[in-house]
């Protein structure tokens, strides 16, 4: 039997991620959300000059075999280093999607400031260890850069996001702020992360789904979504913190 679990969080009022929902003249509503807020993916262009955009990254980089590493012992603003990952990550294979599970959201809801305050973070040694494993992508259920804790107090510059610099700089995509990773009981499983189809974007909101019961690679990845390329509905902004942004 094949079962699936969705790992995207709800879009609702948030102290750090501005969102707005309003109705138009039809039986519909318009949603305004940051593409790097809530559950989303990062393409290398998010932080890396001349890095690949979401359009240039093949969808199968976000789909395939995944391996789970439990890093919950690092809750409470503790670093995730290479020594811990070496001990916990024995099941990692080249080309996997690596899923780092801290269970942060189970202890501190991501709508609270404590979610950032008590999040673990990857230090440089941990980030480099992940790159050495040559994964397709990495999934996080926590804000993985130490510098992210300062976002509510000051403008954090691009170079301070060292985990982003190391991992996106190695052409490895992120899936950030996943939830319900505690429901995953297997060390290896299939994971599909389905991003919104934004033209030449440095990332976008996505829905990661873990699937259990598939025995082999018996699938083909085809994107059937239309591109949001109308300037009336898609606008990009260059921020002071993320100074590469969209192309």
Predicted regions located by residue number:
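Active-/binding-site microenvironments in catalytic and ligand-binding cores
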Residues: 1-247
């Amino acid at each position: 039997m094949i079962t699936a679990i969705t790992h995207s969080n709800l879009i609702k009022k948030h102290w750090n991620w501005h969102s707005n929902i309003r109705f138009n003249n039809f039986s519909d509503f318009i949603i305004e959300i940051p593409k790097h807020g809530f559950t989303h993916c990062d393409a290398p262009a998010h932080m890396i000059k001349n890095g690949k955009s979401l359009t240039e990254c093949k969808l199968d980089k976000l789909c395939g075999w995944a391996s789970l590493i439990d890093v919950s012992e690092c809750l409470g603003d503790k670093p995730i280093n290479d020594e811990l990952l070496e001990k916990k990550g024995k099941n990692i294979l080249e080309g996997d999607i690596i899923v780092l599970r801290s269970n942060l959201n189970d202890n501190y809801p991501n709508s609270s400031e404590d979610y950032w305050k008590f999040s673990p973070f990857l230090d440089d040694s941990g980030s480099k260890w992940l790159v050495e494993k040559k994964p397709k992508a990495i999934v996080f259920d926590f804000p993985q850069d130490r510098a992210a804790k300062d976002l509510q107090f000051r403008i954090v510059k691009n170079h301070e996001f060292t985990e982003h610099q190391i991992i996106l700089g190695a052409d490895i995509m992120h899936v950030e702020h996943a939830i319900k990773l505690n429901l995953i009981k297997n060390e290896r499983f299939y994971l599909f992360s389905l991003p919104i189809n934004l033209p030449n974007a440095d990332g976008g909101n996505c829905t990661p789904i873990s699937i259990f019961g598939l025995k082999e690679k018996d699938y083909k990845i085809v994107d059937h979504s239309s591109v949001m390329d109308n300037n009336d509905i898609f606008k990009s902004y260059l921020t002071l913190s993320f100074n590469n942004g969209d192309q």
